[in-house]
Design a protein with these regions (language model features):
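Membrane-interfacial hairpin junctions
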Residues: 197-209
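Hydrophobic pocket/interface hotspot
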Residues: 28-33, 39, 60-64, 94, ...
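Short structured motifs
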Residues: 15-16, 47-49, 63, 95-98, ...
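A short, structured loop/turn motif at beta-sheet edges
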Residues: 23-27, 53-57, 82-90, 113-122
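Beta-strand/loop substructures that line and gate deep hydrophobic ligand-binding cavities in soluble
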Residues: 6-10, 68-76, 83, 95-151, ...
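A conserved amphipathic terminal alpha-helix motif
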Residues: 128-175, 182
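Surface-exposed, charged secondary-structure patches
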Residues: 55, 65-70
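Hydrophobic ligand-binding cavity/cleft-lining segments
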Residues: 1-61, 184-199, 213, 217-290
Length: 290
């Protein structure tokens, strides 16, 4: 049924899947996710997205940046969106690549689906990539990099949801997340301090029992206290596709042009290693369904 896109070495790597329900209009979510100035405000995976050109078929070429304290990872990408499909959905497909040896992500591809529901929509992404950073990236991808990217994608989706539903600016939800995390960290440090005193001080058995109970109670309350609804959480997202259709990339991904980069200093623009193969292992819809 579906067509698999990908390199042989990527076949064993599980694509990242994230889905969240959003109680907002399709137009609202489309604008917040497709506008290159708004997209990086909620998506932790990008610091800047700079469109460079668009062809006659609507395929958009862009550059992206991810700012680190001492380095900026740069890459290129192509994307194509379909706002109005015959089935009522909207979709967007993407291919990306980077020549940055410090990037943990190499060439890859993915998609977004906007699936209408009775009270809003399901916002879905699936993507896969070749690990970057050479042997180190290969070694760390499955256990560290890929789970971290999945978490970053999920918490970003919840930031988008809060923005679309409640007009809570992404920087404000980020600050609330840090406040929540800080408060929980203080609680755990306090609990650890109480438990440490139990073993470091000479006190009666009753006092030790009381301090132990207090320390354990503080730790449990800190861990179990529900997160406020305004604090973004990755746990509000699905991380496994509920059905086969959701996990399929739109068929337009197969025909999307690969991003192009400059081959060295002053070199000609050449197709990247993602040309005609995307480093993804994503099942796509049959042709003709976008």
């Amino acid at each position: 049924m579906g067509k698999r896109l990908g390199l042989a070495e990527s076949a064993k790597r599980t694509p990242i899947y994230v889905e969240i329900p959003i109680r907002a209009t399709m137009e609202r979510v489309w604008e917040l996710s497709q506008n290159p100035e708004l997209h990086p405000r909620w998506d932790l995976r990008f610091s800047r997205i700079i469109p460079t050109d668009q062809d006659a078929n609507g395929q958009l070429r862009f550059r992206y940046e991810f700012l680190l304290p001492l380095h900026t990872i740069k890459g290129t990408g192509t994307s194509l969106g379909h706002r109005h499909r015959s089935d009522g959905q909207a979709t967007s497909v993407l291919k990306f690549d980077t020549a940055d040896v410090l990037s943990p992500i190499g060439a890859g591809a993915g998609y977004w689906r906007y699936v209408p529901t009775a009270d809003g929509l399901r916002f879905i992404t699936g993507y896969n990539y070749q690990p970057g950073m050479g042997f180190l990236g290969q070694a760390l991808d499955a256990r560290l990099i890929r789970p971290a990217l999945g978490w970053a994608t999920a918490i970003s989706f919840d930031r988008l949801r809060l923005w679309a539903e409640s007009d809570l600016e992404p920087q404000d939800s980020r600050n609330l997340w840090f406040l929540d995390a800080g408060a929980r960290a203080i609680g755990m440090v306090g609990a650890a301090s109480l438990l440490r005193r139990v073993f470091s001080q000479r006190t009666t058995t009753g006092a030790k029992a009381g301090m132990t109970a207090l320390g354990m109670s503080v730790a449990l309350a800190t861990w179990a206290l529900p997160t406020h609804s305004s604090v973004p959480r990755a746990g509000r997202c699905l991380r496994t596709a509920p059905d086969a259709r959701s996990a399929r990339a739109p068929s337009a991904l197969a025909d999307l042009k690969a991003p192009r980069q400059h081959d060295g200093e002053g070199g000609e623009a050449v197709a990247t290693r993602a040309e005609n193969q995307t480093a993804a292992s994503i099942t796509s819809e049959p042709a003709g369904k976008y």
